[in-house]
Amino acid sequence: MHALSLRLLKGNYGIMETLKFNELNISPEIFRGVKDMGFEEASPIQSKAIPIAMTGADIIGQAQTGTGKTAAFGIPVLEKVKKEIKHPQTLILCPTRELAVQAAEEIRKLAKYMHGVKVLPIYGGQDITKQIRALKGAQIIIG
């Protein structure tokens, strides 16, 4: 059994050094997606969380709205996805339907050039039969 590493990322990031996305050792496909979204420099939460999460460590991150938390966990998730495996590999839980849809949209943008990666938001109020069918081939489930 492997020991889990847990790190808490919290605090005032206003004075923290940030990194450029090309310094984060992300794949060229994800880097292109990031650039298409108009970003060159990672936010403080991204600069701190992405390198730790890419090692496989478990993290808990806390930052204000609009600081890039979705990319902070989404980029490491995308780096770990095995495109050839066409079943769920990652489950992301969100407190609301709106956040699940928003997170799925952002992760799809990041994965724009990762052909063969399927991101699927699942939430209540939808036809369960359609959602079960949509699970086929999805590697990242967000609900």
Residue ranges: model-predicted function:
Residues 17-62:
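Conserved pre-motif I regulatory segment
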Residues 63-67:
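The conserved Walker
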Residues 46, 57, 69, 89, ...:
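Short, cationic motifs built from Arg/Lys/His that form the positively charged side of catalytic pockets
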Residues 32, 86-143:
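Conserved nucleic-acid-binding Ia/Ib motif block in the N-terminal RecA-like helicase ATPase lobe
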